[in-house]
Structures are given as C-alpha cells and as structure tokens.
Amino acid sequence: PEMVAAVAISGRLDFNPITDTLTAENGEQVKLSEPKGSELPSKGFDVEDNGYQAPSEDGSSVQVKVNPDSDRLQLLEPFEPWDGQNITGAKVLIKAFGKCTTDHISMAGPWLKYRGHLDNISNNMLIGAVNAYNMETNSVKNQLTGEYDAVPAVARAYKAAGVPSIVVGDQNYGEGSSREHAAMEPRHLGVKAVLVKSFARIHETNLKKQGMLGLTFANEADYDKILEDDTVNFLDLDQFAPGRQLTLEFVHADGSKDTIMANHTYNAQQIGWFKAGSALNLIALQEN
C-alpha cells in the first residue's frame, strides 16, 4: 500500500521513494518520509463484526430455513438406502461415446448459480455427453414412450415411474475436475449404477460416496453388446463383496439376453456407503 501511495503521489510508475524526489510548489526537491505504523494492531486481531452471530450452545434444535421458492438454494434430503434386493428392470439412460468428462456430466458456466439447488442443477446432467446410439448430445430414447428427449427429462420420467436407470460409459469416464455434482445429479435423478470401460479415479470415488455403483466391464468388448432398448437386471447384488464380480443381465427388445460381468473396487467400508445410501448416511447412522 505504501508503494501504491508513493507512485500515485508522484504520478510515475517508475518512482523510487528511496532515491527519487518530488518537486514542491516552491521548486524545492523533497523526499517522502519513510512510512511508520504499528507492527501489530493495538487491540489485537479481533474484529467487532456486527454481522457475526455466535453459534448456539445446543444446536440440536437449530433449523436452517431456506425459501422454498428459491431457485438457487435447496435443502438436501438424504438419499434412500439400498433395500437389500437386486436392482431389476433398469433402463439404459445413455451409452456415452468417447470422452465424457465431469463437464460433460455436469456443465459449469451459467449452471454454477444453481450449485446450491440440486434439483435445478440436475437439469444439466449429461447434456454434453454424446449418445452412442445416435451420436447426438442431449438426445436419448425414453423407453417408456419411445420418444427422444433431453437426458435429464428422460431420467426424471424414469424416476417418476419408479424405474431405475443406469449409465454406460467409455474410457476414463469422469475425467477432469473433482466435481461432486457429477455424482450427485445422477443419484438424485434415479441412476443406480454407472458401468464403464474405465473410470477417472476421483469420479469413481465420488460415485461411491453418493451410494451409487461404479462398475467397470470385465471385458471391455461387452460395451458393444448393450443396446438402446435394453432392460438391465442385477443377478447377484445381494452378494456384493470386496473383490467379487457382479453379474448383470441385459435383456434385449427381442427377448434375447447377454450376461455381462462387472468389476468393482469397493472395500468393506465403501460397500457400507452403498448399503446406507451414501457415505454421509452411514456417518449419521454411526453417530446415532
């Protein structure tokens, strides 16, 4: 700040207050005095801020109130825990082709203003991903109607009908920034599992924390077996355990089936996250 003041007074960016002088009104050459001040504030670093409110000694009865009409803030509800049953009758929401980063899954830009409102920001879910079946973005088939619509709209339709869905992806799915919304949005819109050729590590962990199944093909060529109208059944999710593959059955529109083996990297604690519905759910259960 002292240098800024000296430069401003002299009107020169190259002014050196140690060696240079200023010309007074009477023509006298003068130097600026060396600035002086207290090394430490006399009253310490405590700032009396009228905006500060001390927390309640007992926070058990404190409620955070958010305007229900706000489009930027929304209280989060805990995700539902696993019911202990195999996931059956799931629909393929999208089979993403090629690169699918966290920005393809949950775009930034103007969407960032909705970061505090999970339902609103979920309207950007996977809108940048390329659908392998038509090579278009944000255009997927709603198996309930046969019509094509935006990815979030189809996901919402499945969720409203009580139909689970899965996302299929390519190599290094979820690369890029560690964007938590890229895992929270599919979870919120009823996606139960993400099955890919390979994951970006942080996104895989984020899926686990939100109580989702992050799975990889045991045989990457099985990616090509998954068809647009497939219905997916998990055959042995009730035996979910560390190091044990999961078996998925893909039932095609003509009634034929393909059985696909999926790998995972879940340890015992992370399986606990899945069963509880999320890592936060499990922490809350343990605290109570």
What residues fall within each predicted segment?
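Long, charged alpha-helical interface segments
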Residues: V66, Q245-A253, D258-N288
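Non-catalytic terminal/interface segments that mediate subunit docking, oligomerization
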Residues: G59-L195
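Mobile "lid/hinge" segments at catalytic clefts and subdomain interfaces of large enzymes
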Residues: P1-Y52, K208, F240-R244
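Acidic, Ser/Thr-rich low-complexity intrinsically disordered segments
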Residues: E28-W82
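Conserved phosphate/anionic-ligand binding catalytic regions in large, soluble enzymes, centered on
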Residues: P1-N16, L93-W111, N172-E185, Y266-I283
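Short coil/turn connectors at secondary-structure junctions
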Residues: P1, I18, N26-E28, I87-K91, ...
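Thiamine diphosphate
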Residues: P1, A6, E204-D258, A262-H264
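Short hydrophobic alpha-helical runs that function as membrane-insertion/retention elements
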Residues: K192-K197, G214-F217
